[in-house]
């Protein structure tokens, strides 16, 4: 599905893929999993492919890609248990599943220490809003 927004006489196009039944969505927290299963398999800006929720097939654990950061930063989070669902060019909105019953959210920056203990939905809303203002 294509969403066309007009903001200050500029057109912004977002894409929402068909809902997913991919077994990989089991890693997502319940509310996010419901979005992927019943509404969209990702919802993102059409040109960059970012500024929104990534399709399940593009979600990656942080240990699956080299970040080029100092070891002290890389060790601040268990990379194999932290995956990102959103990127904005400078940071990644992530979910850490070290405690699967109570996943934590964080921002993984491309050039700085992660911001831990964030409210996932507040950051998601804010970053989508920022995308509309570009």
Residue positions per predicted region:
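Short, solvent-exposed loop/turn segments at secondary-structure junctions
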Residues: 89-93, 100-101, 112-114
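A broadly tuned preference for mixed-charge, low-complexity surface segments
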Residues: 88-89, 102-106, 132-134
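Membrane topogenic helices and adjacent juxtamembrane segments
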Residues: 1-5, 100-102, 108
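A surface-exposed partner-binding patch
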Residues: 1-93
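Short conserved micro-motifs at the rims of enzyme active sites and ligand-binding pockets
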Residues: 95-98, 106-107, 119
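Catalytic loop of the DD-peptidase/beta-lactamase superfamily, centered on the K-T-G motif
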Residues: 47, 98-99, 103
């Amino acid at each position: 599905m294509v969403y066309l927004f007009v903001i200050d006489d500029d057109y912004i196009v977002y894409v929402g893929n068909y809902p997913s039944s991919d077994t990989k969505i089991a890693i997502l927290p319940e509310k996010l999993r419901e979005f992927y299963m019943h509404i969209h398999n990702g919802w993102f800006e059409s040109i960059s492919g970012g500024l929104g929720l990534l399709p399940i097939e593009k979600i990656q654990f942080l240990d699956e890609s080299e970040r080029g950061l100092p070891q002290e930063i890389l060790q601040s989070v268990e990379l194999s248990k932290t995956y990102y669902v959103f990127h904005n060019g400078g940071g990644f909105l992530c979910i850490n599943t070290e405690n699967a019953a109570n996943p934590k959210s964080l921002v993984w920056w491309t050039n700085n220490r992660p911001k831990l203990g964030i409210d996932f939905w507040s950051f998601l809303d804010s970053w989508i809003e920022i995308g509309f203002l570009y």
